[in-house]
């Protein structure tokens, strides 16, 4: 068990000046023996690209519905059920989309409400954001929402106090901490496997990081999203198999818009540079996911946790 002390913070919000001590305890994993349960989780962060990436005040459009349909087509073809982390504004605008996911046997969890990064919020703002996200997604899904993933993995070293707020709002699990340093997010030297975070007062959250392949001193993100679009497929598959060999589940994520190569051409105010970087790899993304999923055992996050003895 260790106590994590954060380095210098990136934000100047008043809330970030208060450090909440976290006890970090590795979760005990029981290697799966039930072949009917998946070993790895396929998760989807459901958001509308323009609103989530360029303008937080923009309306949610039906592009998100059409893009989710593309995801479902791939999952149906692979015979895989996924976990959909749905943004609150999406659930509020298209509640029937969320209820349809549940009806088809997929799992629904929360992905914030506004898509503003959590490190830009103070404690009161964060509590309102999380509470609204949880209630909105639960109302649309008709099921309890117990897991959370922060928009853009925006729980960083300087706002780890957000874990305390997650517990206060009623979340039991989190998949927000990217366990390596990247350009815009991540915490270096963070545990790669599932672990428990205990805050002052005894509240405990199960933290489930996305897939990072550790090769000696090198850490390679094979978790999905842009990494799935940029890295060679064989590297991704090798990394995921290495995680399996290390006896821990691989948590993979993506976004519905990554399955749509034509979407960026629909915006007149998106620069060529942004379109090129955001569109890279989208044309082959669905095929890539459809190739990787059948080669490994993927399913809903709740089933994966049950397989590893964590539920």
Where are these regions (language model features)?
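Low-acidity, Ser/Thr- and Arg-rich intrinsically disordered low-complexity segments
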Residues: 2, 9-16
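Active-site beta->alpha N-cap acidic-glycine motif
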Residues: 19-107
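Conserved, mostly hydrophobic/aromatic
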Residues: 45, 75, 111, 148, ...
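The substrate-binding groove and active-site-proximal loops of carbohydrate-active enzymes
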Residues: 55-62, 86-87, 114-126, 150-154, ...
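Generic structural signal for well-ordered alpha-helices
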Residues: 68-72, 95-99, 127-134, 163, ...
């Amino acid at each position: 068990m260790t106590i994590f002390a954060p380095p210098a913070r990136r934000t100047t919000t008043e809330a970030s000046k208060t450090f909440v001590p976290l006890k970090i305890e590795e979760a005990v994993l029981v290697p799966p023996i039930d072949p009917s349960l998946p070993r790895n989780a396929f998760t989807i962060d459901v958001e509308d690209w323009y609103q989530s990436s360029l303008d937080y005040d923009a309306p949610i459009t039906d592009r998100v519905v059409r893009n989710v349909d593309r995801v479902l087509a791939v999952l149906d073809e692979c015979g895989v059920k996924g976990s959909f982390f749905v943004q609150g504004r999406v659930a509020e605008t298209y509640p029937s989309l969320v209820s349809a996911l549940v009806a088809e046997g997929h799992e629904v969890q929360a992905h914030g409400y506004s898509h503003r990064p959590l490190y830009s919020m103070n404690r009161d703002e964060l509590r309102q954001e999380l509470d609204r996200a949880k209630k909105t997604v639960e109302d649309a899904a008709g099921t309890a929402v117990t897991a959370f993933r922060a928009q853009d993995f925006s729980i960083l070293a300087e706002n780890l106090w957000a874990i305390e707020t997650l517990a206060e709002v009623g979340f039991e699990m989190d998949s927000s901490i990217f366990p390596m340093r990247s350009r815009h997010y991540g915490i270096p030297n963070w545990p790669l496997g599932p672990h428990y975070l205990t805050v002052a007062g005894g509240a405990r959250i199960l933290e489930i990081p996305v897939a990072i392949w550790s090769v000696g001193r090198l850490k390679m993100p094979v978790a999905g999203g842009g990494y799935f679009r940029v890295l060679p497929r064989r590297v991704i598959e090798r990394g995921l198999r290495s995680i399996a060999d290390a006896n821990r589940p691989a948590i993979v994520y993506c976004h519905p818009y990554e399955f749509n190569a034509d979407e960026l051409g629909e915006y007149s105010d998106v620069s060529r540079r942004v379109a090129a970087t955001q569109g890279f790899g989208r044309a082959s993304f669905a095929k890539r996911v459809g190739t990787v999923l059948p080669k490994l055992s993927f399913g809903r996050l709740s089933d994966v946790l049950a397989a590893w003895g964590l539920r």
